[in-house]
Amino acid sequence: MAKREKLLKPRQAIAKMDPYRPPSSGRGGKMRLDFNENTEGCSPRALQRLKGLGGDTLAVYPEYEEALPQLARHFRVAPNQLTLTNGTDEAIQLVVNTFVNPGDRVLIPRPTYAMYRFYAQVMGAEIVEVDYRKDLSFPLKELMSQINSRARAVFIANPNNPTGSSASPAQLRFLLRAAPRAAVLVDEAYFEFSGQTALPWMDTYPNLFVSRTFSKAYGLAGLRVGCLFSNETNIAAIRKGQSPYSVNVAAVAAALEAVKDRAFIRRYVGEVRRARAMLCTELTRLGWKYFPSDANFILVDFGPHARRMRDALGEREILVRDRSYELPGCVRITVGAEAQTRKLVSVLRSATKGVAR
């Protein structure tokens, strides 16, 4: 019998990782309040542009020469201060690949978006996670205590996911000054709902990076497109290590139309903010604790009833995200349109009546 060949061994950093398996099926036809997506879809203008793409366009590699200046004008930056990315995930990966070596220290608040830890682990970095405070406010002092000469990256989601809380401009500026040798990424995936941005600071802080996505307010999550911003020198370095065609033609075309349809974004964001206020009012009336949010979701503390409340919503085909594995008793609920929120509230009322407290 032939001797069995030895299997290849992955790098130690990969071997030590736990696989990341987000829910990826069984969501069709349901009220999707679990992934913080736009619950109504993308701009009709973007959809029409996608329908108009011809075979000749799809047959060639994407070109970004015209897209970058148009997006730069929209975001009020220079074309050499941004690069297109395959969603926020690639933006995170590019910052790690460009500025972090194996063994370097990466600071990440906890809980937060899982991909910060994911890409730092792939690199083999030393990951230091700093817990948000009990009231889920930003742990500035705790982060500061972990900054040392080996700190090469700090990842801040602002507003944060899943807490919905934000670091103040003063706190972010303090952190940027305190970690001059680290790439500080401020992930503004939920900017449209909060209105707070660090983009104007790029000329002041050479270690600042900002990411934006078209997956949330713009309703283009399925196309995977975003932007990474920093000063000209940083972006030149980022582009050196970036795949030349990481963002596809359809994604670029849709993004360019999406930013032109400002009325669509204003209407949707305004509706979500009103629905968020409606949901908070109802949660208070029902006696459920929740955490104030600057994003398009609310983190609700159902305590020992978290699973029961999640399942009650699921039975009515309303999907929510149980975050009890990192915040005991907490469920994250995406805020959609007002009509969707009224249906959600109706189910919450019914489910609450069946819970003994």
Residue ranges and their predicted role:
Residues A2-G87, L94, R357:
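N-terminal small-domain helix-loop-helix segment of the aminotransferase-like
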Residues A78-L82, P102-R105, R150, E188, ...:
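Short acidic capping loops at alpha-helix termini that bridge into adjacent secondary structure
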Residues T98-I156:
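PLP-dependent aminotransferase-like
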Residues K134-E192:
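Active-site phosphate-binding strand-loop segment of PLP-dependent enzymes
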Residues A170, D311-L319, S324-R357:
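PLP-dependent enzyme catalytic core of the Aspartate aminotransferase-like
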Residues N207-F291:
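PLP-dependent aminotransferase class I/II
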Residues V272-R273, A277, E282-R316:
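Conserved PLP-binding catalytic core of the aspartate aminotransferase-like
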